[in-house]
Amino acid sequence: MSRSVLAEGVKPREVWAWAMYDFANSAYTTTVVTAIFNAYFVAVVAGGAAWATLAWTTTQAIASIAIMLTAASVGAWADRHGNKKKLLAITTVGCVAATALLYWVGPGDVVLAMCLVAIASFFFGSGENIIAAFLPELAGDEDLGKVSGWGWSWGYLGGMSCLGLCLAWIVAAKGRGEGAESFVPAAMLITAVFFAVA
């Protein structure tokens, strides 16, 4: 990242740390929301019921509404106390913990799955709002798009990296004769650890 696009006094390593958050948290949306757990929820947790997809989308809608209703007050609190990093840590721990707890979701655990995914998605979305609030502090006005795009690209790389790890685990588990109720929960632990340490 060229220093010329950064705000005055900002070091490249600060932008690197900011972008690496996208690298880490994209593991959640890629494996839980988009590619693995959503299919597991519909086919295994809900047993392929006709209402399963509606239940999944309702869960995401509830989380989105909760984010919408709380974003302004959370942002105001962060601005008033000047402690965005603490809030970001809280949202990260919340999403990681709820994702890890998906390990315990098996066939028939519809309510548990919906609650955990709603919590994880709420913390993820709230964290996205907070991390975005750092951008004007990192880049000059004319270069916000460049720095944002750089972080976005790292997010894609992180999401695909975690998905690759999970799929490698799933292929190996299938080779051992394991079913989805075994290898998908383990993939959720992989996702949680990836988000926590990446």
Region locations from a protein language model:
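MFS 12-TM fold signature
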Residues: Q60, T92-T99, G155, F194-A198
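C-terminal ends and interior cores of transmembrane alpha-helices
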Residues: M68, A89-D109
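Cytoplasmic helix-loop-helix junction between adjacent transmembrane helices
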Residues: L116-W154
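Central cavity-lining transmembrane alpha-helices of secondary-active solute carriers
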Residues: T53-W77, A97-A98, M160-L163
